[in-house]
Amino acid sequence: MLRFPQYHLLFGPVSINPEYGQASKELILSYLRHNRLADDLVPFVRAKNPPRAMSLHEADLDVLQRCAFDLEHVSGLVSDLEPDAKQVPVLLKHYLKLNGRLITFNVDDSFGGCLDGLIVVDLTKVDPKLLAAYLTEEGARSFLEYHDFHA
């Protein structure tokens, strides 16, 4: 990003391990679809193998969603649902803290049935202090100045 500051969009897959229970995956997926979907980009991408229809009853999912005000609540609910108390995947949390948005979801059978989300992060929309943690203060300042942002 420092060598080529004209590029400010990052995109790629972020995975939810198939070891997560179905209820946890559905809760995470539902939260992402309702709160972090890149609606403007959805029409341009189609998953080869989209996740099947949810197995949770709509009423059950609705109750879980009402308890999930933000990502930390979702993570806590997932931890309660999982036998080993794992939470929302760490990499996914990091991308979401960078204001990442999901475009579509795909089940990757060649990777053990992982649930993959195609995520996009616009680095010009990341909090400058958080950006500095990745690019250094000087790097973040230089990057943002290139894009006419003044932190």
Language model features by range: what are they?
Residues L2-A151:
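Terminal substrate-recognition subdomain of acyl/acetyltransferases
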